[in-house]
């Protein structure tokens, strides 16, 4: 069994927080990109489209590696049932809280912004269900995927731990070349599965719950397991935290391929399958780029960094409806895309931080948006002298 390190790994906490917070410029730039979203500016910006594509190409792959790392750390700390309960509570409770408080009002707002409120009664029962699945899960999809992954890893982590007890983990050797081949094969395998589904029964791919629970889990699970393995094997972790010119160059070339596929690919052809192969290996290489960068610059304790590490989930949860509100009601009045982007950042981040500070002062909201029970300090119970 791998001992849990006594010292907190600050760079991983910081990277996870900043990856979460990158969702804010990602969604604001989406308004000004050439991609069709709920709300868009009158004219798209080439550079903001490029910025948006860059964030989208790797952010969640690296995020799930870090999630897998910390998840296995807790797996060794708690009994199995308690581990599952703690992990599911910490992601499931915020998700269930955000649906009625955030994504439901967001959905109602968009119905009127997009002029679809009148046509809602005419939709079939399935169309209403599927629309609600997409719109209510919305940006919370990764929390649902983490619940599914945690449940699957009750078995997967047990198998990993049992195999470790019967083998010498010090002899395990990893290289970026071997990992690249493995993840290339995983990307091709995912593409084959998606193409097979597309041929056999294409409507299921537009089903929101199937997309989140099956397809997204299937794609990101290798990264989650990779994170667990990085916790188990110090050599693998060192491989990611050591700067590699090869990984950086490969990631740059993969990003160019990603852009070309976005530009010239067709959804009716092989665009999505090609993208899955590219982003699978790109995500692996960016783990090295991001980890090595973070290990060099973010591996320290700071009150300011700790604040945003603690606030990142709440800020991410509330930023999405704020971004859509900004895009629907404020963006049309700002003619400059870059000025609108900067104003959007100030608007969303400013209000999100204010809401975060308010929710800290309300114990029920603090619990609901973190999934962590509020623990009273012993000093609070001591009688006054």
Swiss-Prot record:
Localization annotation: Cell membrane
Job of this protein: Necessary for the succinyl substitution of periplasmic glucans. Could catalyze the transfer of succinyl residues from the cytoplasmic side of the membrane to the nascent glucan backbones on the periplasmic side of the membrane.
Pathway named in the protein's UniProt entry: Glycan metabolism; osmoregulated periplasmic glucan (OPG) biosynthesis
Entry similarity comment: Belongs to the acyltransferase 3 family. OpgC subfamily.
Record has Membrane as a keyword: yes
E.C. numbers: 2.1.-.-
GO CC aspect terms: plasma membrane
Membrane topology type: Multi-pass membrane protein
Region forming the signal peptide: none
GO molecular function ontology, one term from the record: acyltransferase activity, transferring groups other than amino-acyl groups
Coiled-coil ranges per UniProt: none
Pfam families: Acyl_transf_3
Main location: membrane
InterPro entries xref list: Acyl_transf_3_dom, Glucan_succinyl_AcylTrfase, Glucans_biosynth_C
The organism of origin for this protein: Escherichia coli O81 (strain ED1a)
Record keywords, A-Z: Acyltransferase, Cell membrane, Membrane, Transferase, Transmembrane, Transmembrane helix
Name the record gives this protein: Glucans biosynthesis protein C
Bilayer-spanning residue ranges: 17-37, 60-80, 91-111, 137-157, 173-193, 212-232, 245-262, 274-294, 311-331, 338-358
Gene Ontology biological process terms in this record: glucan biosynthetic process
Kinase keyword on record: no
């Amino acid at each position: 069994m791998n001992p849990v390190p006594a010292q907190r790994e600050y760079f991983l906490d910081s990277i996870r927080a900043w990856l979460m917070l990158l969702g804010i410029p990602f969604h604001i730039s989406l308004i000004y990109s050439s991609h069709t979203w709920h709300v868009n500016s009158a004219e798209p910006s080439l550079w903001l489209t490029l910025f948006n594509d860059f964030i989208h190409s790797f952010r969640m792959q690296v995020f799930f590696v870090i999630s897998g790392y910390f998840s296995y750390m807790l797996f060794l700390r708690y009994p199995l049932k308690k581990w599952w309960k703690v992990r599911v509570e910490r992601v499931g409770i915020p998700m269930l809280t955000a649906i009625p408080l955030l994504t439901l009002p967001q959905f109602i707002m968009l119905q009127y912004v997009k002029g679809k409120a009148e046509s809602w009664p005419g939709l079939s029962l399935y169309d209403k269900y599927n629309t609600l699945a997409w719109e209510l899960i919305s940006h919370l999809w990764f929390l649902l995927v983490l619940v599914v992954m945690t449940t699957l890893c009750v078995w997967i982590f047990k198998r990993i731990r049992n195999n470790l007890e019967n083998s010498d983990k010090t002899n395990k050797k990893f290289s970026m070349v071997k990992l690249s081949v493995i993840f290339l094969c995983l990307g091709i395998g995912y593409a084959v599965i998606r193409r097979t589904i597309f041929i056999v029964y294409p409507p299921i791919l537009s089903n929101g719950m199937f997309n989140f629970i099956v397809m997204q889990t299937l794609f990101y699970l290798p990264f989650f397991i990779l994170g667990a393995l990085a916790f188990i094997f110090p050599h693998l972790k060192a491989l990611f935290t050591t700067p590699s010119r090869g990984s950086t160059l490969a990631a740059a070339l993969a990003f160019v391929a990603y852009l070309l596929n976005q530009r010239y690919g067709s959804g009716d052809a092989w665009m999505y399958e090609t993208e899955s192969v590219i982003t699978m290996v790109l995500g692996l290489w960016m783990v090295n780029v991001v980890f090595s960068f973070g290990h060099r610059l973010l591996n320290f304790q700071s009150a300011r960094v700790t604040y945003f590490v603690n606030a990142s989930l709440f800020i991410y949860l509330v930023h999405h409806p704020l971004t859509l509100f900004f895009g629907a009601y404020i963006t049309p009045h700002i003619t400059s895309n870059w000025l609108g982007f900067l104003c959007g950042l100030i608007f969303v981040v400013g209000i999100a931080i204010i809401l975060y500070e308010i929710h800290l002062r309300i114990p029920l909201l603090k619990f609901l948006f973190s999934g962590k029970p509020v623990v009273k300090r012993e000093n609070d119970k001591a009688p006054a002298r």
